[in-house]
Amino acid sequence: MDYNKRSSVSTVPNAAPIRVGFVGLNAAKGWAIKTHYPAILQLSSQFQITALYSPKIETSIATIQRLKLSNATAFPTLESFASSSTIDMIVIAIQVASHYEVVMPLLEFSKNNPNLKYLFVEWALACSLDQAESIYKAAAERGVQTIISLQGRKSPYILRAKELISQGYIGDINSIEIAGNGGWYGYERPVKSPKYIYEIGNGVDLVTTTFGHTIDILQYMTSSYFSRINAMVFNNIPEQELIDERGNRLGQRVPKTVPDHLLFQGTLLNGNVPVSCSFKGGKPTKKFTKNLVIDIHGTKGDLKLEGDAGFAEISNLVLYYSGTRANDFPLANGQQAPLDPGYDAGKEIMEVYHLRNYNAIVGNIHRLYQSISDFHFNTKKIPELPSQFVMQGFDFEGFPTLMDALILHRLIESVYKSNMMGSTLNVSNISHYSL
């Protein structure tokens, strides 16, 4: 069996579900209720929510009642939550600015819970590389399997592109261009938009979030980290005008300290491939171009990924492929789909891959949870499956870990350093992490 192929649909395990404790699940608002909760709801045989923690216990109680979480308990303190033996996996779905102050004591308190096996943290891991390294060390010392929410790796479009590249359908990669729109960081700001995403240092900005997710996806698709990078980061829009829900200007301007434009270029370690990337803030538009375009040019063919938003990890993309071979999706039984009788192996063809009704916001997180389930229950019957692994790297199987997050944090740190120094940096050792 080839474990580097894309996963087939997993079977439902005949075992007790993974018991999940949430920090940040709120039925009234937030990222967790929009993504994590519906994903778990679709995998109710594999996961069960058993614990909630919020600084205000009333929020957790209200969430349990509203979502009818009959097996869940609301905990009054972080210590009592982390110590509970009813939790197998803790999910951190709060603002990045609070990750360090919550996760560090949580890992210490969790030593009283012998059943804790998994720690799942939303990207970014922390507000800085130093904080991220500290969280990684604490999690490693605690001995839990870690997961980071770089869910773009689970997008069906990214996995298909990765297959086409890894199986040689486009030959050797010659060059890559990326252009994206970061949306929030233009001249206008919705009045109800949270203030923290416009303030530098909170771990949510054009470089860390928009670029970070996209460049992780690119490295994953191409199975290569960068060797050299050069970057320019701009904040040319230091103030934004507030607008209401209908787009009407409110006559009030507010400060913005996060970047609104990024120019990035570099070369991949594998093949010395040049990569150019531009991300801008501003009102997304469908009038002239897509808000995300990734062009990958090879010696035998080309790939193009397009999306209506500059956030590849939560967008329903379209994948275009032009080359000499395609249309060989693996079937569930491991066999190849039959080619069209009129198919000419030497003739250039084009493939358009798009799932019309795919909800990428929930779907990619759902696939991430499915991968955790596959690992926990070994639903693919992989012989000698390890009880833990340090990083996913570029493997098809598994899920991204805090080590994968550290490597990405180091690249982002290098982006800001390159901008500050005005020079090209050697980042070839970025994945050789010794702590």
Curated annotation (Swiss-Prot):
Gene3D superfamilies, A to Z: Dihydrodipicolinate Reductase, domain 2, NAD(P)-binding Rossmann-like Domain
A GO term for molecular function: RNA polymerase II-specific DNA-binding transcription factor binding
GO cellular component, one term: nucleus
Entry superkingdom: Eukaryota
Keyword terms: Acetylation, Carbohydrate metabolism, DNA-binding, Galactose metabolism, Repressor, Transcription, Transcription regulation
Subunit structure: Monomer.
Family: To K.lactis GAL80.
Described function: This protein is a negative regulator for the gene expression of the lactose/galactose metabolic genes. It binds to GAL4 and so blocks transcriptional activation by it, in the absence of an inducing sugar.
Additional facts recorded: Present with 784 molecules/cell in log phase SD medium.
Protein name stated in the entry: Galactose/lactose metabolism regulatory protein GAL80
Species for this entry: Saccharomyces cerevisiae (strain ATCC 204508 / S288c) (Baker's yeast)
